[in-house]
Amino acid sequence: MESIVFNVEPRDCDKNAAKKLRDQGKVPAVVYHKGEETIHICVDERSLKKLVHSSESHLIDLTFPDGKEKRSFLKEVQFDPVTDKIIHADFQFFSAGEVLEMDVPTTFIGEGEAPGVVAGGNVQVILHSLKVKAVPSNIPQHITIDVSGMELGQTMHIREIPVETYEGKFEIISDPDSSVVSIVAPKVEAEVIESEEEEETPAVASEEE
């Protein structure tokens, strides 16, 4: 997995200071690791937003003003419920060889070859990421899932993801019964059927009269 660099700065942790940082285009954040003191920092909002909406996962080298670096990963992000802006982030340090749990984005291949798509269906992605467990060197930037064998109306669950997808390098620890992707009938067909039923209703009422 590739790493990216984030320049960070220490920050005060009172509410007024946090608001001021957000007004300056920065996001209040914390960095923690089991057995170590939590560090309060701030990061550039644009850089963090780009990372959050990336289709790949990354390790992050947090660089402090004194030149020190801490390798970490993004653990959690909080959004404003009204504006959807990022208002807080949690990063987690880790040591070499430590087993991590991370959310990794999903990508899909073989859509055009899937019998369900050939029959007119659409691919509906349900899970855009999966939680995996592994040492950092084995965590992928994304998990590629082949849907080329899926039929119309079929749903793939986590437990059905082929083992060769991850080659034993990491463990998927999300709920195995969770649905990942489905091939569904086009909505247009459903709308046409509903419209036809509505047109037939007055005719039935007329006969009863």
Curated annotation (Swiss-Prot):
Belongs to the bacterial ribosomal protein bL25 family. CTC subfamily. One of its GO terms (biological process) is translation. Disulfide bonds: none annotated. Keywords: Ribonucleoprotein, Ribosomal protein, RNA-binding, rRNA-binding. Pfam families: Ribosomal_L25p, Ribosomal_TL5_C. GO terms for cellular component: cytosolic large ribosomal subunit. This is one of the proteins that binds to the 5S RNA in the ribosome where it forms part of the central protuberance. It comes from Chlorobium phaeobacteroides (strain BS1). Part of the 50S ribosomal subunit; part of the 5S rRNA/L5/L18/L25 subcomplex. Contacts the 5S rRNA. Binds to the 5S rRNA independently of L5 and L18. This is Large ribosomal subunit protein bL25. GO terms for molecular function: 5S rRNA binding; structural constituent of ribosome.
